[in-house]
């Protein structure tokens, strides 16, 4: 399912450890990561996953910006990452890749079961970045809902071969 914060890495790991396909909702993973870091990341789970991220400079930048030891004050607002657009800044691209990596890495940690990432075809701007992060964490399955994902197989093949990929965005309105 696409339950943001419900179909997360913990549930996906538990389902996968029971011999079924555990699925992480890929929607708003960047927001979930940054908010949980600002809540202090009790137990250090997210920081441990970021330490395994293959681009340490990106992980450091995320931690420097969003991690608050002990958590933010209850009345303090969250620092919210910018909304992703068709040309996101480098820092946001890194955050989306890392957040997808973290979710899949944690869902797969400590077992050999299958873990998938579920993305929505209609939310296209983070798709390439989320797929790349999930593939870095060795995601087993990619599921796509809310549309026909015609471009996704080629993108996955390109990333698997170590090549860059691109995706055309559907634009409506004026």
Regions found by a protein language model. Give the residues of each.
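Active-site entrance/lid segments in N-terminal catalytic domains of soluble metabolic enzymes
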Residues: 1-174
